[in-house]
Amino acid sequence: MAHLHPYPLGRLTSRILSELAAEGPVLDFPRAKLVRGPGGRDWSTTLHGTKVATPLGPAAGPHTQLAQNIVLAYLGGCRIFELKTVQLMDELVIPRPCIDVRTVGFNVEWSQELKLEQSLEEYVKASMLLEVLAASGHLGLDPGFERFAFDLSVGYDLKGIQHERVQAFLHGMLDATKVIDRLRPELPKPYRDLPFRKCISDTLTLSTFHGCPPGEIESITRYLMEDVGLHCVVKLNPTLNGPTEARRLFNEVLGYRYRIPDAAFANDPTFEQAVDLVTRLEATAKKTGRGLGVKFSNTLVVENEGDFLPASEKSQYLSGQPLHVLAMNLVARFRGVFGDRLPISFSAGIERHNFPDAVALGLVPVTVCTDLLLPGGYARASTYFQELAT
């Protein structure tokens, strides 16, 4: 995977608008794959009280770090954008290659590839660009189909999240006025004075280390709701299935040979612990007036066989189709405990054929990583809506 370099807002905007006017591909996104709306249907939903045009989005991952990533997903009909997880340690040396999607998905890359300050600017740029696109009229969107929401993600421990640099990032997303005003002069004159949204996001999905104890997860979520004022979604691990059930589903039912190490279960919450912590957090959410949900699921730790990703990494993180079954099993179990009162976000092996079923289950948002990293990229999203309409 190549190193990432932010593209100046002015040049990016000029390119997008000129390519739209020329009625050809936009950022190499095929014109025929543009999703302009439901054509009389209603695909809209809400995210913590914010109405959005569709429940689909890119999951937090390597493809949600740069402003142009978000624009491309928007062209494909995505309207809920899970932004790449950021953390205090933003100068990590990431082993490369760090992603393998030859069959299912594997990665050894678990944090942002930009500095915190760069990530803030990229997300603000992305929000501004989407508003410029809607204002331009070039996309020919159905009424209301421009509505979108950004969902933050931070990690990986309370000490890091409380650091002043991460705090500056969070508060910059809650009120981006300074960044917006600094970027306005880069825009073409007709768009400089648009009333851009100042709150880029007030919702957050918490990402924690594999092996993060339940007490730490609870402390972080309480802090984010009580002190920062964010709606929170707690991303949970497929290890909640427990070692016996996880291995039965993964190795016996699905037939995958990869080994889930005992260490993957060592410090992760059990299902019962997760139920208890979510129950307590429901009370915190009610007290603070914030929204609370859970997300299924994080990646699955498996042993790295060293045939593609660096052999120096003893573990790799699995995503894609096999994760779908493990995560859906947890959705069923959580629904058995909480009914429909607890919103569930879902990202695990979603592709065009199972997307309609996930939507029918009332999962919001339904987000995608591995499938969008395959040939066709963000344009693959348009096929999801073709399936949803049939």
At which residue positions do the language-model features occur?
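Generic long, charged, amphipathic alpha-helical segments
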Residues: 314-344
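Short beta-strand/loop segments at the ligand-binding rim of alpha/beta enzyme cores
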Residues: 51-57, 289-292, 334-347
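Iron-sulfur (Fe-S) cluster-binding modules
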Residues: 227, 365, 386-390
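C-terminal helical cap(s) of enzyme catalytic domains, especially alpha/beta-barrels
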Residues: 91-108, 311-312, 374-390
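Glycine-rich phosphate-binding active-site loops on the catalytic face of alpha/beta enzymes
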Residues: 77-90, 238, 357-384
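Active-site entrance/lid segments in N-terminal catalytic domains of soluble metabolic enzymes
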Residues: 2-35, 39-40, 44, 57-291, ...
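Glycine-rich beta-to-alpha transition loops that act as phosphate-gripper elements at the mouths
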Residues: 60-63, 298-300, 342-355
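Catalytic cores of alpha/beta
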Residues: 67-75, 219-222, 349-368
